[in-house]
Amino acid sequence: MKTKCICELCSCGRHHCPHLPTKIYDKTEKPCLLSEYTENYPFYHSYLPRESFKPRREYQKGPIPMEGLTTSRRDFGPHKVAPVKVHQYDQFVPSEENMDLLTTYKKDYNPYPVCRVDPIKPRDSKYPCSDKMECLPTYKADYLPWNQPRREPLRLEHKYQPASVRFDNRTTHQDDYPIKGLVKTISCKPLAMPKLCNIPLEDVTNYKMSYVAHPVEKRFVHEAEKFRPCEIPFESLTTQKQSYRGLMGEPAKSLKPLARPPGLDMPFCNTTEFRDKYQAWPMPRMFSKAPITYVPPEDRMDLLTTVQAHYTCPKGAPAQSCRPALQIKKCGRFEGSSTTKDDYKQWSSMRTEPVKPVPQLDLPTEPLDCLTTTRAHYVPHLPINTKSCKPHWSGPRGNVPVESQTTYTISFTPKEMGRCLASYPEPPGYTFEEVDALGHRIYKPVSQAGSQQSSHLSVDDSENPNQRELEVLA
């Protein structure tokens, strides 16, 4: 006979055996494959589960113990290592002589007496020369102005005169794209058809028919109480003033420092070591020459410069230019020959015409009618009025009460409330057999006579209100 556990005997769904992750009653290494999924969904033998990717323990270590030798220990033997001798320095004994605090600069460079050096200035001439300098620059002596005729310009004469007749030549764009007149387009707008139905639209809705207006109560407005000033006069007293009264004490002393602290009445000594060693030399008085008073001339100004007045142009011929004159050939072709011109003669060349593709489209000469595919092939049709399948309104509904019968009340058949077998300490009709390795309590069905006795016992147990139920927590 088939045995059952608490999970299989329960009919209310509140009793089940604890699903433990490991077997607490069986000491085996087999994994526990029991779960809620495996209980509800049976295993199909036609489908095999995939193998585990966990590596297998195929490696078996040898019984010989491993030697504690490495390549470094085997090839390199130990040598005697002596400790490093540390040099012992002599103990420092401070000298009893005093330090002279002299530097190398003071030892090598002895001081010498310092005297002032007179400034190096050019000697002043007490007797200035009043003669005027008569000299002629080299440029004016060598290059004298002369009268030379003006050269004729080498540019060509401007002989072009635009024609007075209008330019009648046409362009390629004007030949290919002639001006065409306006194209009359056909309107695709449908004609205004007369309305087939003149019945006005009913604006009656279910809300307007079933809505019943109720009188609205007047809104309650809360009136604020008027402010009443207090009749007791305000004494400007607070809890602080009443509880803590001021006491007479010493006046506060000022912590402001004095404007001039005592002991600083002596003047500040602004002398330094540099000012004591290096005194200022007596400076002689600077010689200043008195300016000469300006005396305006009595003669009339001749408006001549010094060069114009004293340097006149002597008689002489203009200097001849050493630059060769330009040999200009106004007519004839240059017939100079070179090796390149002799070897590579010029040949007659014809202008190549551009390669134009053969036009594959024949452009129409008629103007474009501006018709699209839709306008050319579209055939207008009259609109078809579809028949409405909406049922006609049968008028407002009366206050007919709703039937209290529903599908649930008609088709529902009450059943007797039976007690779950798993709620008993010992389920009736079953005897406890064992607890398996996963903690499931296995029960075995008894014989017919035993089941009748157990049924009597179950009735007696149901009459006892203090009977303890079996509760197995997950």
Curated annotation (Swiss-Prot):
InterPro entries: SAXO1/2 (IPR033336). One of its GO terms (cellular component) is centriole. Residues 300-332 are annotated as: Mn 9. One of its GO terms (molecular function) is microtubule binding. Residues 166-199 are annotated as: Mn 5. Residues 448-457 have a biased composition (Polar residues). The keyword Cytoplasm applies. GO terms for biological process: cell projection organization; cellular response to cold; cold acclimation; positive regulation of cilium assembly; protein stabilization. Residues 200-232 are annotated as: Mn 6. The Mn regions are involved in microtubule-binding and stabilization at low temperature. They are required and sufficient for cilium targeting. The N-terminal region (residues 1-29) might play a role in centriole retention. This is Stabilizer of axonemal microtubules 1. The gene is SAXO1.
